[in-house]
Design a protein with these regions (language model features):
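Short phosphate-binding loop-to-helix
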Residues: 60-87
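A short, N-terminal amphipathic alpha-helix
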Residues: 29-46
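Active-site acidic Asp-centered loop
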Residues: 89-91
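N-terminal nucleotide-binding beta1-loop-alpha1 segment
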Residues: 1-16
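Short, glycine-/small-residue-rich phosphate/pyrophosphate-handling segment
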Residues: 124-146
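Acidic donor-binding segment of Leloir-type glycosyltransferases
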Residues: 45-64
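Conserved donor-nucleotide/metal-binding helix-loop-beta segment in metal-dependent transferases, i.e.
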Residues: 94-120
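Hydrophobic targeting segments
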Residues: 2-6, 33, 47-48
Length: 146
């Protein structure tokens, strides 16, 4: 199963602008990305980081990087169209555990979603080739309805 980690490499975590400057937000985002990559590897998968710009920080050798300057929704949908089944895990989940990933991929369901507290989508596993994402607003509800 392919595993994809979308990562906004330019201007990450803008909602934290009131408390962190741009360099601090970028460093914070990179640390979380690294944690998620390591967790996906610990779950036995080889992650592909889908980044909006080149990443200069080293990642574990088992991770590959694809750079796509499209908005993340379009970039993820392009990847989904190319391959199925696929696990997609957001890059800002520092509490993610390998067991969480195992739970997502263990089912035979066409779509398994891990919702975020604010109505977003933290991760999903899809076996449905026609599934597409929409990461705006309450994406969890949009993805459930798809």
């Amino acid at each position: 199963m392919r595993s994809l980690i979308p990562f906004a490499a330019t201007e990450p975590k803008t909602r934290l602008a009131p408390v962190l400057d741009p360099d601090e937000r970028a460093a914070f985002a990179r640390v979380m990305l690294s944690s998620v990559v390591e967790t996906v590897i610990a779950a036995g998968l080889e992650p592909t980081v889908l980044a909006t710009a080149p990443i200069t920080d080293p990642l574990p050798a088992a991770a590959s990087i694809v750079v796509d300057d499209q908005p993340l929704t379009a970039a993820v949908n392009e990847q989904l169209a190319a391959d199925s089944p696929m696990l997609v895990v957001m890059a800002d989940l520092p509490l993610l555990r390998a067991a969480d990933i195992h739970d997502l991929v263990a089912t035979d369901a066409d779509l398994t979603i891990a919702p975020g507290l604010g109505g977003g989508t933290n991760a999903f596993c899809t076996r449905e080739p026609a599934f597409r994402v929409d990461y705006h607003g309450a994406s969890y509800l949009d993805h459930r309805a798809a």
